Structures are given as C-alpha cells and as structure tokens.
Design a protein with these regions (language model features):
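Catalytic cores of phosphodiester-bond hydrolases, prominently lipid phosphodiesterases
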Residues: 39-363
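Secretory targeting and sorting signals
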Residues: 1-38
Length: 363
C-alpha cells in the first residue's frame, strides 16, 4: 500500500503549547504524585501514549548503581550502546570502549540478583537484567529498549542480524514485543508490512503490554562516521525483515529498525531502496529538530512511534540534568502534545527526575 500522505502541522501551535503547559500545571502534577498507572490505559494503544526515559541509562553508574535502579524510577525507556567486539564476537555495552563493557549491568539468574554483583557485563546481561526486572514487575508499563549499535553488526557469525534476533529473543524471552506481534491481525493473518500494521493501529493495547519490552535499534556514531549509509543497521535490518517475511519466518525477528534524524516530510524518503520504507515505523530524532519539523502530528496520526532525545534542548532550553519539576513536566507535556511517543532525558537528578514515571496521552 502507498505510504501515508503528510499532514500539515495543526494550526494554532501556540494554543497547543499553552494547552500542554496547562496540562502540566493542572493534570500532570497530580499524575506525578499519583502511581504511574493513574492514566486509564484500557482505552489506549501503545502508540497513543507518551512516556519519559533515560538517555544512556547503562552509563549513569553514579546515579544508578545498577540498571535495575534506573528501572525502579518508572522510566518508560532505557538506552544501551553496543559494540560488536571484533576480537571475541561478543556484544559489549559501553559509551566509547569498543573492546570492553563499561556499564551498570550485572550477571543475574533471577530477579533477586539484579541489585548485586559485578557490573560491566555484556549485552546479554543487560537484557537479562531488564527481563528479570519486568518479571518482578508484571504490571509495569511497557519499556522501550533503545539500542544504539555503535559500530553496527559485526563480522562474526554471532553478530549477524539473524544471530542478534536469537540473542534478543533468548535474553528477553517471554517479555519482548516483536515485529510479528505488530503484523499479526486478530484473525491470525498478517499485514503486508509494518507500515500497514502501524497505520491500522495494530499495536497492542497499552494495558495488555504491561511487563513487556519493545526494542528499537539505531545506527551508531562510529558506524555513521566510517561506513556507507547503505550498510548501516537500519537498512541492513529492514532488508532482513523483508527476507524473513518473504520466507515465512517473520516470527524470528526481535527488534524494530528506527529511522534516525528528523527532516521535513517523511524521513523514510531518504532510502533510495523504496522497498525498505514500509518496514520503518519507529523514528528517533532530536527533540529540538522534531518540534521544528513542522509536521509532528504526522507521526501520531499514522500511529508511528517517535522517540525524541535531548528534551531540554527545545526553546527555551532547560537544564540538561536537573530542571525544576514544573519545567520538566511542562516540557514532557509539550512534546507529548507534539506527538512524541518517548521523551529521552538526562534528568536523573531531583527534582527533575520526578517526571520519569509519567505516562501521558499523546497528541
């Protein structure tokens, strides 16, 4: 089916912003003081709400001794940075070391283990920590696991898209929401691609996805600096999805490739291989660029997931790490009104961290 036509940004953007601020002042404050489930989830799908998250969650070791401590904030998004280790074929998790893991993940074999033990573990342990935390919190709202694949997929057989699927499915066993889940209709048949499924709003009901994780992958900074865009993980994995779908093996897919970076119009038009475009329904972009795009409601109207980063960097800029709670709430409300699905922040300091458990209606 053809991709949806872009809508122009709704008139009266200043009224929308004012409404967002009013929501923050009146409704969101009450929501922040109440349990995370103050919102009646039964009438919303996954694409109908906005959650708040933590940028580079694995790297905040001073603020969150363990990854589980970050999850305890009620965050709707955690971020992991992976390196395909060329020496041993493993997936390291660190910000800048391509040959070692530097993070707050531990080796756990049960939910009792996620707050103890040696940190600086590989990706499998980070995913295990998330899984065990979710199993211990089965009524938690769904968690978006954002993975920046710093140097892309690796040269080892254990670092291919197929192997990565198995890896994620194994370590998030029983809790991961997959592309096949989105594609499958109520009668068991499949939509022809992810775009058709998303625009039909076939995402699961938000309440039914409690205790689940959804994984997006984006191209990494190193990969972008040294490789042709045609080899980046977004395009490689989108082609992988097509191959799995055509072979009747789409149930093996574990993650959603994300279009990285905002631009005016449909960002998928950058892909010269038009067959890839309908396999992207997750978008990841800077909050400032997202707001200035001019058509943010397009993401919401078509039920795409929009992850926005650096929430502080929208005019007027806020503190990047410790805004007032009122300012943080107003910013999240504004981005929710503008159609963001997940608002990524570095607000791990009080009082701004009080916003992390918020889940708001989107749009």
């Amino acid at each position: 089916m053809p991709l949806p036509t872009l809508l122009t940004k709704r008139a009266g953007s200043r009224l929308l912003a004012a409404a967002a601020l009013l929501l923050s002042a009146v409704g969101v404050g009450a929501a922040a003081a109440a349990p995370a489930h103050a919102l009646d989830y039964s009438s919303y799908h996954l694409a109908g709400v906005t959650g708040t998250g933590l940028h580079n969650t694995y790297d905040d070791k001073a603020e969150y001794t363990y990854l589980a401590n970050a999850l305890d904030t009620g965050t709707s998004l955690v971020e992991l940075d992976t390196w395909a280790n060329a020496l041993n074929g493993k997936w390291d998790v660190s910000h800048s070391d391509p040959l070692a893991s530097v993070n707050n993940c531990v080796q756990a074999s049960s939910s009792a283990d996620i707050y103890t033990g040696d940190r600086n573990q590989n990706l499998d342990s980070c995913l295990d920590d998330i899984r065990y935390w979710l199993l211990a919190h089965p009524t938690s709202h769904p968690i978006m696991v954002k993975i920046e694949m710093k140097n892309g997929f690796g040269s080892w057989s254990s670092q291919s898209p197929t192997a990565f699927d198995t890896y994620v499915q194994t370590h998030l066993s029983g809790v991961v929401y997959t592309p096949a889940d989105l594609l499958t209709k109520s009668d068991g048949s499949l939509y022809p691609n992810l775009d058709a499924a998303a625009t039909a709003n076939n995402w699961g009901n938000y309440a039914s996805l409690e205790g689940k994780a959804i994984v997006e992958i984006i191209p990494g900074t190193y990969e972008q600096a040294v490789s042709s865009s045609s080899t980046w993980v977004d395009q490689v994995y989108a082609q992988h999805l097509i191959d799995l779908y055509n072979s009747g093996e789409i149930s093996q897919a574990a993650v959603f490739p994300s279009v990285l970076g905002a631009q005016t119009g449909d960002p998928r038009l950058r892909y010269s291989n038009t067959a890839l475009r309908p396999w992207f329904v997750v978008f990841d972009q800077d909050a400032g660029a997202f707001v200035s795009d001019g058509a943010t409601e397009w993401y919401n109207t078509n039920h795409y997931l929009a992850v926005v980063t650096d929430a502080y960097d929208v005019t007027p800029a806020l503190s990047s790490s410790a805004p007032s709670l009122a300012d943080a709430q107003a910013r999240v409300a504004l981005l929710a009104a503008d159609g963001a699905s997940y608002v990524s922040t570095d607000w791990y300091n009080s009082p701004g961290d009080g916003v992390l458990s918020e889940v708001l209606p989107r749009g």
